[in-house]
Amino acid sequence: MLIKHLQEHFFRELTKTEHLEKIKEGTLPYNRLMSYYKCAIMEVETKFKVLNEQFSLHYDENPIEAIKSRLKSPDSIMKKLRKKELPFTTDAIEENITDIAGIRVVCSFEEDIYKMADCLLQQDDVTLIERKDYIKHPKESGYRSLHLICLLYT
C-alpha cells in the first residue's frame, strides 16, 4: 500500500507542468541535433536520387538499386558514450560519434559503387573525412562495402 502511494505521488510530481518544462528544456539540444542529422540524411538521399536520375538521362542506366537510411537510436548513442566514458551531451555526441546518421546505397555493379562515391565527393558541399574500402579489402567475415564518413555543409 505504501509503495503504491509513493508511486502515485512520484508520478504526480513528475508530471507537474514545471517538471515537464524542465524535461523539455533538457532534451531540446538533443532534439535539435537529431533534427540536424535527419535533415542531412534527407539532403544526401536527395543527392543520390539526383545522381541516379542524371545517370539515367545521360547514360541510360540506373546504377542505384536502393537507398536506405537510419538514425542511431538514443539508446545506442548512450551506450556508445558510456563505452567511451563520455557524458551524454550534444558536444560529446558531435565530437565523438561518427555514425549517428547512415545511408546505405545499394548498386548492382561494383564499378557503380565507386562512380556514385566519386560523384558524391565531387560536390562542393561534401567533404570526405574517412574512407573504409571493404570491397578491395574485405573483412574476415567476407563483408564487402565502401564506407564514406563525410562532412556535409548546409
Predicted regions span which residues?
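Charge-rich, low-complexity segments
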Residues: 1-96
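Short flexible coil/turn linkers enriched for glycine and charged/polar residues
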Residues: 97-99, 142
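Short cationic amphipathic helices and targeting signals
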Residues: 101-107
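Mid-length scaffold segments of soluble, non-membrane domains
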Residues: 107-108, 113
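Beta-rich nucleic-acid/ligand-interaction surfaces
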Residues: 114, 126-149
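Short amphipathic alpha-helices in soluble, non-transmembrane regions
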Residues: 116-123
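Conserved small/polar residues in nucleotide/adenosyl-binding loops
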Residues: 153-154
